[in-house]
């Protein structure tokens, strides 16, 4: 019937099309079955869900292919043995990386001749003349940068390698930030050292070769201010009474009675002191240094210091005990140029200060520098960069945070902020913003302090 109506030719074409349609449908069904079995579609879902899963599968695969290529490249890079390229291999995890792998000590240290006495360098006897000539020839670098305002270089530093505990370097960063803030406010230059200039003078004594080198390299400096890395400024407004020291070459926190009469090894502190740049200072360094070389010399000197100084424990010679011994036994040679400062805290022992910060805030104000508001809080014995300290780690770190925030609040108040508490890293706003910011009053006078250096072109030698 169909053939009569459509004709034989058309009928054969329709039959051929139907057969092709059957084959197409069969192929489609087979494709769906294969996809459902290989990519996980069809888990009791509807055809619509199957279609969504198929789309997601191909989309995820398309996104994953570039990552797979990168992973293959990184894997290939890990197996390479390049010397310094960006893909030289190794883990991306800083926490698990052994930092000691990148430290290379090139060659052995040069050993000194044991038959020769130790010296910091060639003997210099005319430094005052050399320095005076230099200052006269370089008037743009005066040693006094304001009336009774000497040019001062604050020097501090730390070891060339990272600290021996996970948080030590963080506290070193806080300490140097604190010192930078004080120096910026008071017109003081700063030098941070991380190099051991003389292997023989490691530990307590490392400061001596550095101090001598800086004095000779910077004749424009009138005073060098050494400060240990574990000491922090806690009175940002206190300006040192420079006029008081016009006739002195060395200023240390201490007491005459404890040093000269009692010979007490803690009668002064060498963690924060001022040294004038002159011939007297070079002579003092030359006299101070011979107890410092590590090994037998330092050990034997330690025995002498323990025997001669009051209450000193038995340990190798340290720079502080050596200074007490030097002043007590050679007072006529050095004492008349040494000022032992007890009027304010050029060094303030942290154990008697940190628990009183809130009381200070309530009753006193910055700018006093003494027990009411200490200029410096020194964390003697905490050793935040070492493996072990002399005090509980938790107490040391908590109090170092409090001391930092105590000083930092004086900086933040300039800009209208303060720490939420002395124990908090977070800050809060303490005054509202204004469209006339220059009319805001700086309560502590630290934004443009009167004591900040004003450069003049006159030399005072």
Curated annotation (Swiss-Prot):
It holds the Pfam family Glyco_transf_34. Its main location: Golgi. The chain crosses the membrane at residues 21-40. It is a single-pass type II membrane protein. Its EC number is 2.4.2.39, 2.4.-.-. It is an enzyme of class 2 (transferase). Disruption phenotype: Reduced xyloglucan content. Keywords: Glycoprotein, Glycosyltransferase, Golgi apparatus, Membrane, Signal-anchor, Transferase, Transmembrane, Transmembrane helix. This is Xyloglucan 6-xylosyltransferase 2. It is found in: Golgi apparatus membrane. The keyword Methyltransferase does not apply. GO terms for biological process: polysaccharide biosynthetic process; xyloglucan metabolic process. InterPro entries: Glyco_trans_34, Nucleotide-diphossugar_trans. Residues 1-20 are cytoplasmic. It comes from Arabidopsis thaliana. Homodimer. Interacts with XXT1 and XXT5. Interacts with FUT1 and XLT2. Residues 41-461 are lumenal. It comes from the Eukaryota. The keyword Transmembrane applies. GO terms for molecular function: protein homodimerization activity; UDP-xylosyltransferase activity; xyloglucan 6-xylosyltransferase activity. Gene3D superfamilies: Spore Coat Polysaccharide Biosynthesis Protein SpsA, Chain A. GO terms for cellular component: cytosol; endosome; Golgi apparatus; Golgi membrane; Golgi trans cisterna; trans-Golgi network. Residues 74-95 are annotated as: Disordered. Belongs to the glycosyltransferase 34 family. Xylosyltransferase specific to UDP-D-xylose that accepts both cellopentaose and cellohexaose as substrates, with a better use of cellohexaose, to produce xyloglucan. Adds preferentially the first xylosyl residue to the fourth glucosyl residue from the reducing end of both acceptors. Transfer one xylose mainly to the second glucose residue from the non-reducing end. The acceptor should have a minimum of four glucose residues. Associates with other xyloglucan-synthesizing enzymes to form multiprotein complexes for xyloglucan synthesis in the Golgi. Glycans are attached at residue 432. It catalyses: Transfers an alpha-D-xylosyl residue from UDP-D-xylose to a glucose residue in xyloglucan, forming an alpha-(1->6)-D-xylosyl-D-glucose linkage.
């Amino acid at each position: 019937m169909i053939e009569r109506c459509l004709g034989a030719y058309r009928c054969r074409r329709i039959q051929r099309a139907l057969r092709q349609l059957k084959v197409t449908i069969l192929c489609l069904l087979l494709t769906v079955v294969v996809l459902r079995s290989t990519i996980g579609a069809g888990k009791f879902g509807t055809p619509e869900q199957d279609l969504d899963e198929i789309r997601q599968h191909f989309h995820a695969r398309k996104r994953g292919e570039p990552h797979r290529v990168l992973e293959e490249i990184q894997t290939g890079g890990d197996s390479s043995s390049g010397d310094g390229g960006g893909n030289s291999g190794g883990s991306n995890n800083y926490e698990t990386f052994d930092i000691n792998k990148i430290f290379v000590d090139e060659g052995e240290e040069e050993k000194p001749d044991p038959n020769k006495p130790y010296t910091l360098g060639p003997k210099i006897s005319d430094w005052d003349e050399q320095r005076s000539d230099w200052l006269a020839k370089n008037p743009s670098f005066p040693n006094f940068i304001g009336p009774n305002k000497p040019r001062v270089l604050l020097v501090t530093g730390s070891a060339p390698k990272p600290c021996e505990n996970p948080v030590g370097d963080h506290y070193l960063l806080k300490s140097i930030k604190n010192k930078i803030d004080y120096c910026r406010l008071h017109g003081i230059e700063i030098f941070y050292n991380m190099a051991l200039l003389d292997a023989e003078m490691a530990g307590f004594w490392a400061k001596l070769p550095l101090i001598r080198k800086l004095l000779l390299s910077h004749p424009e400096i009138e005073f060098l201010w050494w400060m240990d890395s574990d000491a922090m400024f806690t009175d940002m407004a206190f300006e040192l009474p420079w006029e008081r020291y016009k006739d002195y070459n060395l200023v240390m926190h201490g007491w005459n009675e404890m040093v000269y009469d009692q010979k007490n090894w803690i009668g002064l502190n060498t963690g924060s002191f001022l040294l004038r740049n002159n011939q007297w200072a070079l002579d003092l360094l030359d006299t101070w240094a011979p107890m410092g070389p590590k090994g037998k010399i330092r050990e034997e000197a330690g025995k002498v210091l323990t025997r001669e100084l009051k209450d000193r424990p038995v340990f190798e010679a340290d720079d502080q005990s050596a200074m007490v011994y030097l002043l007590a036994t050679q007072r006529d040679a050095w004492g008349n140029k040494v000022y032992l400062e007890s009027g304010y805290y050029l060094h303030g022992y942290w154990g008697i200060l940190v628990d009183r910060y809130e009381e200070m805030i309530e009753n006193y104000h910055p700018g006093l520098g003494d027990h009411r508001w200490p200029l410096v809080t020194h964390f003697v014995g905490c050793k935040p960069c070492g493996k072990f300290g002399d005090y509980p780690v938790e107490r040391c770190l908590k109090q170092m945070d409090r001391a930092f925030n105590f000083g930092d609040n004086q900086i933040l108040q300039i800009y209208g902020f303060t720490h939420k508490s002395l124990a908090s890293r977070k800050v809060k706003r303490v005054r509202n913003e204004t469209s006339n910011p220059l009319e805001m009053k700086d309560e502590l006078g630290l934004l443009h302090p009167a004591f900040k250096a004003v450069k003049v072109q006159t030399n005072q030698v």
